Amino acid sequence: MYRIKDEWGEFLVRLARRAIEEYLRTGREIEPPKDIPPELWEKMGVFVTLNRHNVPPQAALRGCIGFPLPIYPLVKATIKAAIYAAVDDPRFPPVKLEEMNNIVVEVSVLTPPELIEGPPEERPKKIKVGRDGLIVEKGIYTGLLLPQVAVEWGWDEEEFLAETCWKAGLPPDCWLDEDTKVYKFTAEIFEEEYPRGPVKRKPLIPQSQD
């Protein structure tokens, strides 16, 4: 059962775009609208992803930042994550306003992370590509990958774990260590079909088990 109605997802995507474009024009963070459903004021984790339009998924990313834990009300978290994704992702130069004409905005609303218990070697059996996102923690190192990333790259569960370890700056087999914590979460994902276009819920299709 969906927590986020389709119309709420559309609202969040439009809000994210407006937050970015207003910040790029004026340097100001917009305030959330007042007349929105109370559910969107609940604290939830959220990520905003910016993808270049008409570019293969593996090369499309232009920025992605968010909050894995529910520390802000969803509307405020969406505004902040959108701005950070546009100007503070250390992997990319800041987005320019004119670039937004060729960028598709995507919003992922996250469930709270759930620690994967049990022996490390059983972790691949406890996650599912097409459903779960992952967080890997070891010492001061942390890495997160959203559920859609594994689908877009065609990874299986072990590859997904290894890539999340890489994202954390750790060896790819660190998920086999007892002192590595692995969390899973799910996400409801909404994206523009094209820049400023209709917003749709993004389905995640698990890999076939051939």
Swiss-Prot record:
Residues 7-201 form the AMMECR1 domain. Gene3D superfamilies: Hypothetical protein ph0010, domain 1, Hypothetical protein ph0010, domain 2. InterPro entries: AMMECR1 (IPR023473), AMMECR1_dom_sf (IPR036071), AMMECR1_domain (IPR002733), AMMECR1_N (IPR027485), AmmeMemoSam_A (IPR027623), Uncharacterised_MJ0810 (IPR023472). HAMAP family: AMMECR1. This is Protein PF1979. It comes from Pyrococcus furiosus (strain ATCC 43587 / DSM 3638 / JCM 8422 / Vc1).
